[in-house]
């Protein structure tokens, strides 16, 4: 259930792999699992990342009396980075909602965020397509649209130009990725927009307009070269 990056920029899976005995099994549980809803008896959904089916069955039995539906994934790197990065991208939805950019923009952000997320997951050693499942798309939509979402609210604050209280997994992830240069942020324009807004929260609307213009130009250039 542990997620995020530690102060050395490592995922929980990397820490487990480096510190547990070679034959010690471990599992990672990620997906749309809002705790208040689980306590209220509502269903939640998750991917359980582990290397063997026996571990999956053991963990599934542990949650037998909880309305938590699990699927199995062997792509531990992929689900790890999907759930880590979704908190970053969720802030973009909060910014867009605060700026009243509209439902069309929200739909656009879902597509672009998943495209970038898939590319990053591949770069970080995961499998193509993993972000389109529960740990990625499922958790992103939940985090990006829930009225109780901390990261959606962070995005709203950034759009208002507020700089205090901008804390959480998303801002910490941005800091670690930048500090340790885990990947080239400039290769992912929406991710770069979010990073820029966290660093300098003035004129977030202008950042979106610049992003849309660049996206349009890139799309036009791509269509002519195909």
What residue ranges belong to the model's regions?
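Short beta-strands and strand-loop turn motifs
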Residues: 1-2, 73, 191
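Rossmann-like NAD(P)(H) cofactor-binding subdomain of soluble oxidoreductases
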Residues: 1-42, 59
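Short glycine-/small-residue-rich Rossmann-like dinucleotide-binding loops
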Residues: 3, 50-51, 146
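Glycine-rich beta-alpha junction loops
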Residues: 5, 30-36, 52, 74-79, ...
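Generic structural "secondary-structure junction" signal
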Residues: 7, 36, 40, 81-83, ...
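Short alpha-helical
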Residues: 7, 54, 149
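Internal alpha-helical scaffold of NAD(P)-dependent oxidoreductase catalytic cores
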Residues: 15-25, 43-130
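NAD(P)-dependent Rossmann-like dehydrogenase/reductase catalytic/cofactor-binding core
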Residues: 86, 93-94, 122-226
């Amino acid at each position: 259930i542990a997620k995020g990056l530690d102060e050395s920029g490592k995922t929980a899976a990397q820490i487990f792999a480096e510190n547990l005995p070679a034959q010690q099994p471990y599992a990672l549980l990620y997906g749309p699992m809002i705790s208040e809803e689980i306590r209220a008896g509502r269903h939640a959904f998750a991917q359980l990342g582990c290397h063997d089916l026996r571990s999956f069955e053991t963990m599934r039995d542990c949650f037998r009396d909880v309305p938590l539906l699990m699927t199995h994934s062997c792509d531990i790197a992929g689900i790890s980075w999907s759930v880590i990065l979704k908190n970053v991208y969720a802030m973009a939805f909060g910014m867009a909602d605060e700026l009243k950019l509209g439902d069309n923009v929200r739909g656009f952000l879902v597509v672009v965020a998943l495209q970038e997320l898939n590319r990053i997951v591949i770069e970080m050693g995961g499998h193509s397509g993993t972000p389109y499942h529960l740990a990625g798309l499922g958790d992103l939509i939940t985090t990006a649209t829930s009225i109780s979402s901390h990261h959606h609210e962070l995005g709203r604050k950034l759009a208002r130009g507020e700089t205090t209280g901008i804390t959480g997994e998303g801002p910490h992830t941005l800091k670690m990725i930048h500090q340790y240069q885990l990947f080239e942020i400039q290769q992912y324009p929406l991710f770069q927009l979010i990073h820029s807004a966290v660093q300098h929260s003035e004129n977030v609307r202008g950042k979106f307009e610049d992003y849309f213009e660049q996206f349009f130009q890139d799309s036009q250039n791509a269509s002519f070269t195909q």
